[in-house]
């Protein structure tokens, strides 16, 4: 099953923990904010990144 990953860029503080934990799913943009790269089937990695986000800017939903 694929998962849609979203980052609320208004909430994101650019901590980059998500990109460090799950580089296949997140990248840091030129704006200093995290952006999802692709939908993912690696729910464990995406959930770990979402839980690690200090401001709760990451959401996951079934694609």
UniProtKB/Swiss-Prot annotation:
[4Fe-4S] cluster binds at residues 12, 15, 18, 53. Disulfide bonds join 22-45. Residues 3-31 form the 4Fe-4S ferredoxin-type domain. Keywords: 3Fe-4S, 4Fe-4S, Disulfide bond, Electron transport, Iron, Iron-sulfur, Metal-binding, Repeat, Transport. Pfam families: Fer4_13. It comes from the Archaea. Coiled coil: none annotated. GO terms for molecular function: 3 iron, 4 sulfur cluster binding; 4 iron, 4 sulfur cluster binding; electron transfer activity; iron ion binding. Its cofactor is [4Fe-4S] cluster; [3Fe-4S] cluster. Binds 1 [4Fe-4S] cluster which readily converts to a stable [3Fe-4S] form. InterPro entries: 3Fe4S_ferredoxin, 4Fe4S_Fe-S-bd, Fe-S_cluster_ET. PANTHER family: FERREDOXIN. Ferredoxins are iron-sulfur proteins that transfer electrons in a wide variety of metabolic reactions. This is Ferredoxin. It comes from Thermococcus kodakarensis (strain ATCC BAA-918 / JCM 12380 / KOD1).
